[in-house]
Amino acid sequence: MTWFIDRRLNGKNKSAVNRQRFLRRYKAQIKQSISEAINKRSVTDIESGESVSIPTDDINEPMFHQGRGGLRNRVHPGNDHFVQNDRIERPQGGGGGGGSGQGQASADGEGKDEFVFQISKDEYLDLLFEDLALPNLKKNQHRQLNEFKTHRAGFTSNGVPANISVVRSLQNSLARRTAMTAGKRRELRALEEDLEAISRSEPVQLLEEERLRKEIAELRAKIERVPFIDTFDLRYKNYEKRPEPSSQAVMFCLMDVSGSMDQATKDMAKRFYILLYLFLSRTYKNVDVVYIRHHTQAKEVDEHEFFYSQETGGTIVSSALKLMDEVVQARYDPAQWNIYAAQASDGDNWADDSPLCHELLAKKILPVVRYYSYIEITRRAHQTLWREYEHLQATFDNFAMQHIRDQEDIYPVFRELFHKQSSKSEA
């Protein structure tokens, strides 16, 4: 009786190579579905995967078929009403749709079926932040920020079929078969020599010759039963993500929590900052994040207070910029740090304070930061703060500003602000 033993440690993932091929082939449709799904998520839902839906028209394989209409001779098997050369009345509608034509009319236009499948958290985040990077990152003398890159790392006994090493697997197969059959082959050679000697001897020893032939046949059968290749022989190319030293960086997150920021606006700002936090923590190992909340006064807070504190008040945006400048001078030397900032506000500010914000950014902050992004979340017309910042955008290349009106704008704006730029890396 033959026994088959499944030694695969990753047997449940035996279709992983097909899954990866599918994700690569339909990446554009999947990314579009993810950009739509992220707007439906809870602000704090970052640990789960995502159900992705793709229109079936996008994944159908092309095929040739008979067009509708025209004259054709066709005999449908199994019918008891028609024979060859009978004329069948053309259905109403000619070459129209494929429906039965018996339903009620609809004004909703075309519909489409969708193919729905689940992607894991890692696949979700990889697609979410693909082709994004911190702009203008410079390598400084003291390197503490690690960016992970994939490198070959020898061979492993587990993996997906796409990474199998044929040469190394066959080498292991040969070594195993040699080790397992070496003793039997020596014994086989000895028996064959004895058989040859007995067959030449006089008188002929028929019983002994028959015994030797039987033992030789048994040994050969045992040798042949050793499988040509076994799961133990398989070796896969191993890849691992290694941290590559880069520059140390700090991200300042400045959020307006004044009374003019209603709960919906604050939720959109939090969504933007959660995306930013996930992007930084997934792409880079060591990035300092400084959280600053402000109304009439600014305060440096921890992550929990930044996202969940209910404190509110009036609006003086310059208080946050002043605090950021103080923190930079106290803890982050621009010669040693890549400094970034992301500011979110509804644009409502005390009118006399907006020129001061322009002055602080132009003279103190923008000259020392690598990149400064401003996001205005409002459906109203832009006010003095936006107009002051427009002058900065025209003057400084490291200043960017975007307008968010609805929740659907958050992810496209985020990608626009942090898309990977093709520029020469600075030493």
Curated annotation (Swiss-Prot):
Stretches for region Disordered: 72-109
InterPro entries, A to Z: UPF0229
Biased composition (Gly residues): 92-102
Segments of skewed composition (Basic and acidic residues): 77-90
UniProt-listed HAMAP family: UPF0229
Entry similarity comment: Belongs to the UPF0229 family.
Name of protein: UPF0229 protein KPN78578_11640
Organism of derivation: Klebsiella pneumoniae subsp. pneumoniae (strain ATCC 700721 / MGH 78578)
